From Swiss-Prot:
The reaction proceeds by a bi uni uni bi ping pong mechanism. Keywords: ATP-binding, Cytoplasm, Ligase, Nucleotide-binding, Pantothenate biosynthesis. It catalyses: (R)-pantoate + beta-alanine + ATP = (R)-pantothenate + AMP + diphosphate + H(+). The gene is panC. CDD domains: PanC. Its EC number is 6.3.2.1. The keyword Nucleotide-binding applies. Transmembrane segments: none annotated. This is Pantothenate synthetase. Catalyzes the condensation of pantoate with beta-alanine in an ATP-dependent reaction via a pantoyl-adenylate intermediate. GO terms for cellular component: cytosol. Beta-alanine binds at residue 57.
Length: 279
């Protein structure tokens, strides 16, 4: 595996490749990330991964400085998973001058849910993903369903900007107790880690209620919010939305069997966790 930091060197290395599969990450790789690499290999060759902790998608009070950086461990894991090139640029490589041009998602998708609680987050994501796509020129790119809203925004962005990249969705990988794998799980204390699976269990109860015929979605959302709060969580949102556009479904759409997803974000101690389940 080649480890490259220079954009020009990356382009030189990939010149002539027309089936590249790309997996962008921020590093601190776990089994969830590695499952993306394996899925990428099913859809293209060679597989290119990137590791870049993107300052643009962190808010002023978020964890950019303490976000775990484990490059040497990550390199070993990628080598074991047959990745052809790791693009690991420095901040100077990616942003040699102030990034004045940004890619802004529409408010109806980028300003809700995560976008409401993390202003500027999706503009940072879209900007860096567009720049990475320009560098790698992949045929396909793999994103995880765990970041459901991000997946939808990136997919729509590629469609609307006519980027010739197929976005592949990868299923969320969970620990044995149901907790969705995340680099931020390492922030949890021992007691918090024991409590953390309750987020997924709460979403499962919401899903089961909807599948069982409950149509008062607002009541389900509030019950889930209250349940987590009573256990010491601080929920940002629990929302049942249409999979197609993350808009709340109408009564008619519910009766017609509109595909739904329940999404949640909540703090447990100092750690903010997100999760979702399709319904």
């Amino acid at each position: 595996m080649k480890v490259i930091s220079s954009i020009q060197e990356l382009r030189d290395q990939l010149r002539g490749q027309n089936r590249t599969a790309f997996v962008p990450t921020m590093g601190n790789l776990h089994e969830g990330h590695l499952s993306l690499m394996r899925l990428a290999r099913q859809h293209g060759d060679p597989v290119v991964a990137s590791i870049f902790v993107n300052r643009l998608q962190f808010g002023p009070n978020e964890d950019f400085d303490k976000y775990p950086r484990t490059l040497q461990d990550d390199i070993e894991k990628l080598q074991q998973n047959n990745v052809y090139v790791l693009f690991a640029p420095t901040e100077r490589d990616m942003y040699p001058e102030p990034q004045e041009y940004r890619v802004l998602p529409p408010d109806d998708l980028g300003g809700i849910l995560e976008g409401e609680f993390r202003p500027g987050f999706f503009a940072g994501v879209c900007t860096v993903v567009t720049k990475l796509m320009s560098c790698v020129q992949p045929r396909v790119a793999v994103f995880g369903k765990k970041d459901y809203q991000q997946l939808m925004i990136v997919r729509r962005m590629c469609q609307q900007l006519a980027l010739p990249v197929e976005i592949i969705a990868a299923e969320t990988v969970r620990d044995e107790d149901g907790l969705a794998l995340s680099s931020r799980n390492r922030y949890l204390t021992t007691d918090e880690r024991k409590e953390a699976p309750e987020l997924a269990k709460t979403l499962q109860r919401v899903r089961d209620s909807v599948l069982g015929g409950e149509r008062d979605l607002g009541k389900l959302e509030q019950q889930a919010h209250t349940h987590l709060a009573e256990r010491g969580w601080v929920p940002d949102y629990i929302a049942i939305r249409r999979r197609a556009n993350l808009i709340a479904p109408s009564a008619a759409e519910l009766e017609a069997g509109e595909p739904l997803v329940v999404l949640a974000a909540a703090k447990l101690g100092a750690t903010r966790l997100i999760d979702n389940l399709e319904i």
